[in-house]
Amino acid sequence: MTYKSFIKPFKLLFATALLFTLSGCSVYNFTGTGKIDAETFQVNYFQNNAELIEPGIERTFTLRLRDLIQNQTNLSITDTGADLIYEGEITQYRVSPMTATADQRAAQNRLSISVNVRFTDRKHEDNDFEKSFSFFYDFNGDSLPSGSVLTAALEEIFERITQDIFNASLAKW
């Protein structure tokens, strides 16, 4: 048996194995979503219905959710008639003391935000849900939730809430 006659079947076997391996990779991606049976999504404007209002957070949240889905999937965004629809409202924006000092002042405060989400999957109605998502950010009691403190708080809170919404709706975690 010559070297060439030995290598030719080996190359064919290797190419076939590689083809099967790569074809299986299309079912899963690094975001954990697997194959999504949809082509389009829409994120309707989330109203701020919290008792305490921080102007502009509803727009920031809506854009964050839209950007996360757009960046982590191959879905196309649309304004109407989408396969997947996200809508809801911000239901809570609350600042509360977490720990106190000896002179009864807040040593640490917590900003909590809750968002009620209605998710509709027009192709698979059994995936639809309405659910509340919330997260918090702790900050120094000497600070107010404004400026850089508020920016950092919203960044962390919205990152967590939007990822939780993404996982619940598309990754099924």
Task: Give residue spans per PLM region.
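Sec-dependent bacterial lipoprotein signal peptides
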Residues: 1-25
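A structural "domain/chain start" motif
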Residues: 22-63, 67, 74, 82, ...
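Surface-exposed short loop/turn segments
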Residues: 29, 71-73, 83-128, 132, ...
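Second-shell loop/turn segments in exported
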Residues: 48-55, 144-154
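Short loop/edge segments at beta-strand edges and connector loops
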Residues: 79
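Compositionally biased, intrinsically disordered linkers/stalks adjacent to structured regions
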Residues: 150-173
